[in-house]
Amino acid sequence: MEVTFVKEFTDKSLHIRAMSESGDEMASGTFALKEMRFGGKYITALAVCGLETKPQYRRQGLIRRMMNIGETFGREKGAPIAVLHAFSFDFYRRYGYERVSDTVITSFPIETLGFVPFFGGLVQLTKELVPAFVA
């Protein structure tokens, strides 16, 4: 099956879509340049974002080809490292990625942040302010 990789560029990102001969989107993903603090200074890193393949097109090497395209974009833009928030660490190890940290998502009462300076332009998100975004 013939596959075409459609690439949409901005100055700081690349979105890739793998398309079949019939025009079906088989896989997609985004690679974005982000400024990150690393080793005591800010550097440009390549963020690997939301890679996906439709189930019927898996195991055809589409993600591998998209990773090659995306990582080349990052290198050409001067990004010495790439980062991602993986759904499966084992999946990305085959591409040379290693687990270097964990992220913990937690919630707590806003009152516990009383020690943080308050800037007048900031308001607490409430159901009344943004009902569509708060469950």
Please report, for each region that a protein language model flagged, where it lies by residue:
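A conserved beta-strand-loop-helix scaffold within acyl/acetyltransferase catalytic domains
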Residues: M1-E52, A135
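Short coil/turn motifs at secondary-structure junctions
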Residues: K34-M36, Q56, F89
